């Protein structure tokens, strides 16, 4: 059994069988008391707790106390703590775990470490990773057609060499400034929305509720989110359908200005629609 945190997207993805779902207990993001009770309540049956330090679906930050509490309760119960940094590892040379000062037992990686090529990886404490050592009796097999492929490894090494501490710091500052500009646009249009996130990752939520939990993020008006996606596309910006924005290192001031202008126009369309009738797309 594993504990996974509630995310800002409801239900199970297609293809997840009831048998798999039966081995997972869903915790409560940023609710330490309830999640700690789940961990303690499942005792020896619990293998791991897995959580994103910032939800990739929603760009909602975990509270430091929540992550510190998870580290404490998993250590207490002899349960592995896994941080999913597939999306968030771009936010620091040591990922968000470095920023929070949290040392997990395992970490999953992806995206940024591949230098633009598809990649996935995991790593952790030596005694945990020793289970995959092929020279040890009873080792867990970990093989795959594309494991350690030279092209991705070379691209990843070069990308990470350029994406050093100075580059990460500068990019996060650019992202924070952009998020502030977008929220200023939201305020100027008097629309029920907010842009959440950290550094170079951010997401627009079209809801009047304070977006502090996954449940609040789910309260966003889905039709207006679709309209925002369409309105941005009509202005030359191809955004993610859920309105997650990621700032690249190559973005220039002119690029950001173009995006803010398109965002302003598109959100104006959304604001007008929200005051009349919700469009059916």
Map each language-model feature to its residues.
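Conserved N-terminal phosphate-binding loop of PLP-dependent enzymes in the Aspartate aminotransferase
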Residues: 1-281
